[in-house]
Amino acid sequence: MDIKLKDFEGPLDLLLHLVSQYKVDIYEVPIVEVIEQYLNYIETLQVMKLEVAGDYMLMASQLMLIKSRRLLPKVVEHIEEEDLEQDLLEKIEEYSRFKAVSQALAKQHDQRAKWYSKPKQELIFEDAILQEDKTVMDLFLAFSNIMAAKRAVLKNNHTVIERDDYKIEDMMASIKQRLEKESVISLSAIFEECQTLNEVISIFLASLELIKLHVVFVEQLSNFGAIILRKEKK
C-alpha cells in the first residue's frame, strides 16, 4: 500500500503550518521546537522512502544551522545568528500575508464563477478532512514527531532493524481487535510495543486506512496532544 499526501506548497508553507499550531505571534513561537518538527517531518519522509524536494532539503540545512547555534553555549552574542533567525521569521510572516491574499483572491474567483452556467469542476485532494477537523497531513506531522522519538529509542537500545514485511491488512485487523477490547487506544502506546521502524510505519499506515474508511475515529484534544483512536465517534 502506498501513502499519498498532499504536498505543501513549499518549505515556508510547511513552516507556517507548524508555527500556526502555537496560536501565538510568529515572533513568539519556540523556534527550536518548530525546527525539530520540520526536521522530523523530512526525516520521516526519507525513512518511508517518499520523495523530498530539493528546496525542502535546502531549508532543512539552514534550520539545522540555526538550531545548532541556538544550542551552543552563549558566550558572545552573534549578530549573524540573530539575523538568520530574524530573516526566517520575517519570511514566514511575509508568506503568511501572501497566502492570505491568495486565498482571498481565490474566494472572489469562486464567487464570480457561480455566475456562469457551466458548473465548476470539483478538484479532489488527497489531503481530505478526516474526523475532528484533522487532515491526513496533520496526522502525518504528529506521526513524524512520534517516529523521531521511536528512532532515538531504537538507536539507544542498539536494536537491530530487521527487514520484516508487515502486511497492512494484518495490522488493520490487529488494531480492530485491540479496539474491541479497549475501545480507546493511543497511537504512541501502540508504537511503544514495536520492535522495528518497519513495524511502526505499517501500523501508522494501517491506522490511517482505518480512519479514512471510518472504521475507527481519531481524536487529538490539543495541537500537541496524544493521537487517540476510538471505536465509536463521540
From Swiss-Prot:
Pfam families: SMC_ScpA (PF02616). InterPro entries: ScpA. GO terms for biological process: cell division; chromosome segregation; DNA replication. Its main location: cytoplasm. One of its GO terms (cellular component) is cytoplasm. The keyword Oxidoreductase does not apply. It comes from the Bacteria. Signal peptide: none annotated. It is found in: Cytoplasm. Keywords: Cell cycle, Cell division, Chromosome partition, Cytoplasm. Transmembrane segments: none annotated. PANTHER family: SEGREGATION AND CONDENSATION PROTEIN A. Participates in chromosomal partition during cell division. May act via the formation of a condensin-like complex containing Smc and ScpB that pull DNA away from mid-cell into both cell halves. Component of a cohesin-like complex composed of ScpA, ScpB and the Smc homodimer, in which ScpA and ScpB bind to the head domain of Smc. The presence of the three proteins is required for the association of the complex with DNA. Belongs to the ScpA family. This is Segregation and condensation protein A. It comes from Streptococcus pyogenes serotype M6 (strain ATCC BAA-946 / MGAS10394). The lineage of its organism: Bacteria, Bacillati, Bacillota, Bacilli, Lactobacillales. The gene is scpA.
